Amino acid sequence: MLDSLLDNDFYKFTMQSAVIKRFPYARARYAFINRGEHAFPPGFGEQLREAVDAMADLSLSVEEKRFLERTCPYLDPTYLDFLSGFRYDPSEVDIVQQGERFELRIEGLWYRTILWEVPLMALISEIWYRMGDGKRDADAIIDMRTRDKIEHYKRLGLKIAEFGTRRRYSYDVHDRVVASLRHHGGDTFSGSSNVHLAMRHGVKPIGTHAHEWFMFHGARFGFKMANSLALEHWVDVYRGDLGIALTDTFTSATFFDSFDKKFAKLFDGVRHDSGDPLEFAAATIAHYERMGIDPRTKTIIFSDALTPERVERIDAFCRGRITTAFGIGTNFTNDVGVTPMNMVIKMTEARPEGQHWMPVIKLSDVPDKNTGDPDMIELAKRVLALSRRA
């Protein structure tokens, strides 16, 4: 079902390169979380198993390597040589189905297992819809809907990227959407998080890092040091490139405590992925002003469950105060007349070199999105004094 090693989100490759350089012997475990309590039909696990096993045959083509060399100079030749030899190992993925319940777990060296999450979620979504009764809208309707959205954003003068790999309806729908965005978007469409589709449609791959980068640092170095060391190590690897920092792994308030003048000047901006976007924008603007930095020289990328209405409201609040860009996922790639799946695959445990397995957690700006061991979540809240903040 997947035809390219690059049918994945860009930040997985940028993180993989950083993990190889900083934590080559670390191990990781991930688990599927069925937030929407979806029921899985008989035979679902077997079909997913077949698709996962087939991923062992994927490899980086010569043309794909040249695309990365040309487009992403911060991915050094040593890493691209590694990626040329990389093959998925399906034995790292354990799939169990009992009745309508479905479980998936991943375990292995972090630099290897880091690539599984996004394609697995895309496969889960596509197989689930294919086996279900729901019928999607016709291609012409999807094309028209996508065109109308990007033309609306164009009239507002915005920068829009497509971030919809994980919960896409299918690869074919995803491909149609990116083609339509490319055709109608002009300068408004800044690129896609999906590296394969960015290459296929001649646009820029977009992304920096995800929550797991910070989650691992919390396990390895402690919650108080997690944000600052995650940022420091990112800078050590990329030397100022890939300069958008994700804020909400241990709450944005905790992040800004670590986002001192050095980081605030060095990073191009921050990404909002949970909580009230207007409150976040106001807090970000205030933080830059306290640092003596003109917020208009910095960028917030908004990427949390965006719709045209939400985007317009955020733009109205931020315009003239701070630069904005928007990463839109499910509203592009699964707005096809069905209910999108509500699921995630998250890192659950990490074993840094020379240490034992330990739980990793995420403390979102929305408590319902917290993930990880409940006791560890409570410990982190105490260590970070989050109860006193509330």
Swiss-Prot record:
Please cite one Gene Ontology biological process associated with this protein. Answer: NAD biosynthetic process via the salvage pathway
Reactions catalysed, as given in the entry: nicotinate + 5-phospho-alpha-D-ribose 1-diphosphate + ATP + H2O = nicotinate beta-D-ribonucleotide + ADP + phosphate + diphosphate
Tell me its EC number(s), please: 6.3.4.21
Extract the Pfam families matched here: NAPRTase (PF04095), NAPRTase_N (PF17767)
Top-rank taxon of the source lineage equals Bacteria
**Would the keyword Ligase be found if you checked this record's keyword annotation?**
yes
Q: How is it modified after translation?
A: Transiently phosphorylated on a His residue during the reaction cycle. Phosphorylation strongly increases the affinity for substrates and increases the rate of nicotinate D-ribonucleotide production. Dephosphorylation regenerates the low-affinity form of the enzyme, leading to product release.
Name of this chain's protein: Nicotinate phosphoribosyltransferase
Gene from which this protein is expressed: pncB
